[in-house]
Each structure stands twice: as C-alpha cells, then as structure tokens.
Amino acid sequence: MVATFVTFCPYRPRTLVRDKADTMKPAFGTLRFCEDAADLAHKGAAFLCEYAASRPGRTIVALSGGNTPKPLYELLAEEPAKSAMPWDQVQWSLGDERFVPPSDPASNYGMARTAFLDDVPVPVENVHPVKTDGVTLEEAARDYEAMLKGLYGSDTLEADKPLLNITLLGLGEDGHTASLLPHEPVLQVDDRWVAPVPKGRVEERITLTYPAINASEIVAFLVSGGGKREVLDKILSGDDSFPASHIRARGDVLWFADRAAAGRWA
C-alpha cells in the first residue's frame, strides 16, 4: 500500500539544500515547498500516510484546526490515502480545541469528523476528542492531559520517548500556533501538558503546551496564503519573537508552505 501511495505524492527525507522535492533548510526547521493549497494538502496527506504505514507499531497524531488542514483531512478519506492509512494503528488527538460542543462549527474535532473521521475505518477508541460537555475549562484540560498520560504510559516525559509522533500545526498572522497566543500566560506554562486558555482576546480554549508539543517526534506546520508570508519569513530566518518560533521537536520541524506563504523562499 505504501508503494501505491508514494506514486500519488512522494515524501522525501530532509536535505541540507533544495532538491527535486523542493525541500530546503532555512534557519529554523525544514521547508517543504508546495505550489498552492491543493499541493500542500496532497503532500501533507502523503507524508502522513507514508509515515504511519512505514511504522511497525502505533502512530499518535495531533490534529490542527483551522481552514488550512481541512483539504488535507478530506484527502485522507479518499483513495488512495484511505487504503494506504493503517487506521487501526493510528491514534488521533488534538493540538488545541475551542471550549464548545463537537456540533459547534468552531469545534476542531467537529471539523475533523466532517472532513475525514466519519468516513474512514478508524476504531472509535483511536479518536480522542476534548470533553467539553458538563465540565469546566480547567477540568477539560486536566482530563485531556490524563488521557495523553494514559496513551504515553507515564506521567513524566522521557527524553528518548516522544509523546506524539506527528503534531500538525497551523500558523497565525500574529505568529501564534495551536492556542499558544502572543503575550498570554499559557506561553509560560512548563509543568503541564495541556492548559486552559481563558476567554480574553479569543474564546475559551484548551491547548497543548510547549512541553507537550516539543516532545513530538515530528512537528509539521501547514502554512498557506499571502497573509502568512511576513511572519513565516521572519520565523524561517530565525526571529524568535513569536510563539511559533519556540516550537521544537525530538526529530524535525517541517514547514509545508505554499508559494503564496513561502514568498522569497519559493
């Protein structure tokens, strides 16, 4: 199944210079250049499928919300991705969530369900939404952290054991990622894996914290559109003044960026 999917859109390992797969190394992470939003979705879906299918055991993926990943998710519910993905071996979690019911249009889990989870043969126990009904924001964050600790098998992060295999992230025009928002107290949280984000500039949310995200084997940013060009350029150049600038990974940080977002890097 892997070989079949590779013909759809191959993922090639990182390299120090740009190659035929349009991979290059800026100051921060590895850039995977994509022609447009559709190409980004295809390359992202191919990467997820090839990665999961190549592993002997389970793969834990943290999904991103927003508009950019939705076409990628929709491809996962179509052939050849639908047959290539080892659904019974993949656990699907969330990088952040708005404190709303799954039926709310703003729900990241609700979007993922509509885009692909309801249309693929994934075991129900492999899908991990945030419980938002009948709990407080703090309880929702603690419950989700407890779920992650159960998956991980420990209450303490270990240097040689990633918490998540792949974490998908978006990038805001203000440099935020997940719900790690500029100037918010959540940026300073270093003793929790999941934290609440009280209502302020945005609605109530919960988010993975830096310690949790940075314990990922691979972090893959999905960045599309000219509105992200300036902030992406600064981050790729090494500017550390944005929340997304402080994302790390046990392996690599990948940037899947389309031509509009990549700008001079394209």
Regions found by a protein language model. Give the residues of each.
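ATP/nucleoside-binding phosphotransfer catalytic cores, i.e., glycine-rich phosphate-binding loops
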Residues: 217-266
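Ligand-binding beta-strand-loop-alpha-helix segment within the catalytic cores
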Residues: 24-28, 85-167
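A glycine- and small-aliphatic-rich helix-loop capping segment at beta-alpha/alpha-beta transitions
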Residues: 74-85, 110, 114, 182-190
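Glycine-rich beta-strand-to-loop/alpha-helix junction loops that act as flexible
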Residues: 63-68, 169-173, 224
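Glycine-rich N-terminal segment of FAD-binding domains in flavoprotein oxidoreductases
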Residues: 53-80
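N-terminal glycine-/serine-/threonine-rich phosphate-binding loop
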Residues: 22-61, 138
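Class I SAM-dependent methyltransferase SAM-binding "motif I" and its flanking Rossmann-like core
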Residues: 166-211
